Regions:
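Metal- and O2-centered redox machinery and metal/ROS homeostasis
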Residues: 1-184
């Protein structure tokens, strides 16, 4: 299954992202609003430069199966930016392109995977001092539907991607992780 293949082959990228965002501080309750601003801003840049490209690559074949309209996160993270008084800016020096729908699915794997962790982050930070006024639009995007949305995504991915396309899917995931890790 391609979802397992991606999990195994992107683990080092996932770990690097956790390190970049000081994720260990979330559970020790030492994560600050400044740390949160960094994670939101970086994820905003990732979504700004990828979401439309991913969706346009997938729209015809996967639009309904993946419920793409319900998966749009850019408007949600823009609300978080506004509530944190952060600027909407671009990362023009970083180009992000996906060659085909398989790469787009790989990139989407990174974004959808972040919603699983994001849900945990939102719950944890809502109990952390200093986060009383923070809205979690992006990290809480699916709320109680996080599990079912992830399950749907994985099922479509595992059903629709043939083994000969695993490398292309992995390539898309690595492209997006590389962008995320280097955009700031």
């Amino acid at each position: 299954m391609v979802s397992e293949y991606l999990k195994q082959n992107t683990a080092e990228y996932h770990d690097a992202a956790e390190k970049l965002f000081n994720s260990e501080k979330i559970f020790s309750k030492t994560f600050t609003v400044e740390d949160y601003k960094k994670i939101i801003h970086t994820n905003y840049l990732m979504l700004l430069h990828s979401e439309d490209k991913i969706f346009s690559s997938l729209a015809d074949k996967f639009g309904e199966k993946l419920q793409l309209k319900q998966r749009a996160k850019l408007p949600l993270i823009e609300k978080d930016l506004a509530s944190l008084a952060l600027e909407n800016r671009t990362a023009d020096s970083h180009i992000l392109e996906f060659e085909n729908e398989h790469e787009a699915l790989g990139a989407m794997y990174v974004i959808e995977g972040s919603t699983l962790g994001g849900n945990v982050i939102a719950k944890q930070l809502s109990k952390t001092e200093g986060f009383d006024e923070v809205t979690f639009n992006f990290f809480g995007c699916y709320q109680e539907n996080t599990g079912p949305m992830w399950k749907n995504f994985k099922e479509v991915l595992d059903t629709e991607v043939a083994e000969e396309n695993y490398q292309e899917v992995l390539s898309g995931a690595k492209k997006l992780y590389t962008f995320l890790l280097n955009v700031n």
